[in-house]
C-alpha cells in the first residue's frame, strides 16, 4: 500500500526535469544570468552578491522550478580551452541558452564562431536555442538588430528548431524571466527530447 501511495504522490507532485545548458564566451554574463534566474524563481533563494561572481572554470549548477517543469541549469565555462568540453553535455540537454556580451564588439566574431559550432552539432538537432544579447543596460551596447546582422550567416544553420534572440541584462534582471518562460514552453512541447523520467516505483 505504501509503495502505491508513494508512487501516486511522486506522480502527482514530482516535476518533469529538463536540463538546460548555458553557453557563451567567458565574461558574457552566464553565471550572473544563472544567479538572477535562481533569485527570480526560487522564493527562498537569497542569491550571491553579483559583484563576487568570477569566471567559471568548469561547471556551475542551478535548479529552477517553473510551473510543472524543473529546469536544471548547467553553466559551462566559456574560455576557449573549455569550449571543447561543451559537447560532452549535448546528449543530455533539452535546451541551450547562448549568452552574448553585447558590449564586446571585438569578440563578436569569436562568439559567432562558438555559436555556429553549437547549432551545427548533430547531438543538438531540434533542441531549442535562446540567444541572449546580454548587458543591454550598458549605453554603448550593440542592439538586437546589430547582433542579428552579425549572426545572420548562422540563420540557415539553425535548422528546424525553436530559436529566439532576446535583449537581456543579467545584472538588472531585465529579460531573465521572459527568457526562462519562453524556454520552458519550448522544452515542454519538444516531443523529440522528453523530460527525464519520473521514478514512480
From Swiss-Prot:
Location within or outside the cell: Golgi apparatus; Golgi apparatus, trans-Golgi network
UniProt keyword annotations, A-Z: Acetylation, Golgi apparatus, GTP-binding, Nucleotide-binding
Family matches, as CDD domains: Arfrp1
PROSITE patterns: ARF
Expression (tissue specificity): Found in most tissues.
Result, substituting residue 108 to V: In a breast cancer sample; somatic mutation
Residue positions binding GTP: 24-31, 75-79, 134-137
Gene Ontology CC annotations of this record: cytosol; Golgi apparatus; membrane; trans-Golgi network; trans-Golgi network membrane
SMART domains: ARF, RAB, SAR
GO MF term list: GTP binding; GTPase activity
Chain positions with N-acetylmethionine modification: 1
A single GO BP: protein localization to Golgi apparatus
UniProt-listed SUPFAM superfamilies: P-loop containing nucleoside triphosphate hydrolases
Domain of life: Eukaryota
PANTHER family attached to this UniProt entry: ADP-RIBOSYLATION FACTOR-RELATED PROTEIN 1
Function: Trans-Golgi-associated GTPase that regulates protein sorting. Controls the targeting of ARL1 and its effector to the trans-Golgi. Required for the lipidation of chylomicrons in the intestine and required for VLDL lipidation in the liver.
Record's subunit section: Interacts with SYS1.
Record family assignment: Belongs to the small GTPase superfamily. Arf family.
NCBIfam families given in the database record: small_GTP
Name listed for the protein in its UniProt record: ADP-ribosylation factor-related protein 1
Protein species of origin: Homo sapiens
Amino acid at each position: 500500500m505504501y509503495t502505491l501511495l508513494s508512487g501516486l504522490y511522486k506522480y502527482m507532485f514530482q516535476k518533469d526535469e529538463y536540463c538546460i545548458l548555458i553557453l557563451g564566451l567567458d565574461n558574457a554574463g552566464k553565471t550572473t544570468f544563472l544567479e538572477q534566474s535562481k533569485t527570480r524563481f526560487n522564493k527562498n533563494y537569497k542569491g550571491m552578491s553579483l559583484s563576487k561572481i568570477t569566471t567559471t572554470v568548469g561547471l556551475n549548477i542551478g535548479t529552477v522550478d517553473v510551473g510543472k517543469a524543473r529546469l536544471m541549469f548547467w553553466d559551462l565555462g566559456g574560455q576557449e580551452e573549455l569550449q571543447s568540453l561543451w559537447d560532452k553535455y549535448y546528449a543530455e540537454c533539452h535546451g541551450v541558452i547562448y549568452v552574448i556580451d553585447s558590449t564586446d564588439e571585438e569578440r563578436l566574431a569569436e562568439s559567432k564562431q562558438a555559436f555556429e559550432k553549437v547549432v551545427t552539432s548533430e547531438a543538438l538537432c531540434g533542441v531549442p536555442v535562446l540567444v541572449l544579447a546580454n548587458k543591454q543596460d550598458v549605453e554603448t551596447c550593440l542592439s538586437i538588430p546589430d547582433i542579428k546582422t552579425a549572426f545572420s550567416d548562422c540563420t540557415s544553420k539553425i535548422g528546424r528548431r525553436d530559436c529566439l534572440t532576446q535583449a537581456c541584462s543579467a545584472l538588472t534582471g531585465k529579460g531573465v524571466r521572459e527568457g526562462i518562460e519562453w524556454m520552458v514552453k519550448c522544452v515542454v512541447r519538444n516531443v523529440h527530447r522528453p523530460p527525464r523520467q519520473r521514478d514512480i516505483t
